[in-house]
């Protein structure tokens, strides 16, 4: 016989579904890269490169942007080898933490396309250098914001202006992180910028309805590759302990998860079931992905997330003596 709690939850689901039906977000996705100009920041490695390969295979015209011109040119040659005749494959070398360079880069990319704004903009550029906050320099704090937030915000701003001025529909896809939802020891120079990126994306999702421009945000967990290896070189032991058991996925699997979400018309896209309870606890009132599943995940999150948080806090406390000893050896303390 069903328990009173089970009956109550069933009633909530049924009643909630009934009243939500008139506003149900049935999304028929118009995502189709074929023949579209796809502009990818951070496209010379990791997720950006894997995404570029997928898009080229689907018949898209692809522009990748990266700081290292030689590396980007090498990727372009790889992409051209799998492209069909007529596809425009190119690269732009630019430091996208500069507003001027960001503006110049996207306009240069559009020259072969009659100066028309890109159809799809994928903001994959960024980096993570985890450290304990008290050991992070002021410059590293600034670099974290520049290399995670501004590196995408400047390009998004110019893309929105280009699309709206030309009355063109399009898509802008932010690549954020699981750490845009939740943060912990070691990510004080990274998570704030990722939170800001989610805030910008949420605001634009609403505002760009005025211009019929679609905004999406991808929030993956760890992605294997050179970037992840560099991250681990500075990652504190306490951070590694909290992340113990987390296995990064390949850029190729990550890119497939991103496109799967875009094809479903999701606004917030994740690559891991573990992220779903966190997403529902922290989504800021944005559109759901699936009403019934999201309701169930929300119920799970009310138990699972507090348990995870207590476990993480316990791990941090267990490292207190070790961290104090290390800081003492470095002469950090004044007495």
Curated annotation (Swiss-Prot):
One of its GO terms (molecular function) is NADPH binding. SMART domains: PKS_KR (SM00822). Catalyzes the reduction of 3'-oxosphinganine (3-ketodihydrosphingosine/KDS) to sphinganine (dihydrosphingosine/DHS), the second step of de novo sphingolipid biosynthesis. The gene is TSC10. Belongs to the short-chain dehydrogenases/reductases (SDR) family. A motif (GXSXG) lies at residues 42-46. It is a single-pass membrane protein. GO terms for cellular component: endoplasmic reticulum membrane. Pathway: Lipid metabolism; sphingolipid metabolism. Its EC number is 1.1.1.102. NADP(+) binds at residues 47, 95, 190, 194, 223. This is 3-ketodihydrosphingosine reductase TSC10. It is found in: Endoplasmic reticulum membrane. The chain crosses the membrane at residues 288-308. It catalyses: sphinganine + NADP(+) = 3-oxosphinganine + NADPH + H(+). It comes from the Eukaryota. The active site is at 190 (proton acceptor), 194 (lowers pka of active site tyr). Gene3D superfamilies: NAD(P)-binding Rossmann-like Domain. Keywords: Endoplasmic reticulum, Lipid metabolism, Membrane, NADP, Nucleotide-binding, Oxidoreductase, Sphingolipid metabolism, Transmembrane, Transmembrane helix. NADPH binds at residues 42, 44-46, 67-68, 71, 95-96. It comes from Cryptococcus neoformans var. neoformans serotype D (strain B-3501A) (Filobasidiella neoformans). One of its GO terms (biological process) is 3-keto-sphinganine metabolic process.
């Amino acid at each position: 016989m069903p328990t009173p709690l089970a009956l109550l939850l069933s009633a909530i689901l049924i009643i909630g579904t009934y009243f939500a039906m008139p506003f149900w977000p049935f999304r028929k996705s118009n995502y189709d890269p074929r023949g579209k100009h796809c502009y990818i920041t951070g496209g010379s490695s990791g997720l950006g490169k894997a995404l570029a390969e997928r898009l080229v295979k689907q018949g898209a015209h692809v522009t990748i942007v990266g700081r290292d011109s030689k590396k980007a040119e090498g990727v372009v040659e790889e992409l051209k080898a799998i492209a069909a005749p007529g596809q425009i494959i190119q690269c732009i070398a630019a430091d996208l933490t500069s507003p001027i360079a960001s503006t110049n880069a996207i306009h240069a990319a559009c020259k072969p396309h009659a100066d028309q704004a890109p159809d799809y903009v994928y903001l994959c550029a960024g980096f993570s250098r985890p450290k304990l906050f008290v050991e992070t320099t002021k410059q590293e704090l600034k670099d974290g914001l520049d290399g995670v937030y501004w590196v995408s915000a400047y390009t998004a701003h110019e893309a929105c202006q280009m699309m709206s001025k030309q009355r063109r529909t399009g898509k802008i896809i932010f690549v954020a992180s699981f750490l845009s939802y939740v943060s912990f020891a070691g990510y004080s120079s990274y998570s704030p910028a990722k939170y800001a990126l989610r805030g910008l994306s949420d605001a634009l999702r609403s505002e760009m309805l005025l211009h019929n421009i679609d905004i999406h945000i991808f929030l993956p967990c760890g992605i294997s590759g050179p970037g992840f290896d560099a991250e681990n070189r500075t990652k504190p032991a306490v951070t590694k302990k909290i992340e113990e058991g987390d296995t990064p996925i390949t850029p190729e699997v990550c890119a497939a998860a991103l496109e799967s979400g875009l094809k479903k018309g999701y606004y917030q896209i994740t690559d891991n079931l573990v992220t779903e309870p966190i997403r529902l606890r922290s989504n800021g009132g944005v559109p759901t992905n699936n009403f019934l599943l999201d309701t169930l995940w929300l119920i799970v999150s009310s138990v699972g997330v507090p348990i995870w948080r207590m476990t993480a806090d316990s791990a941090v406390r267990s490292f207190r003596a070790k961290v104090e000893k290390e800081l003492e050896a470095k002469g950090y303390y004044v007495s």
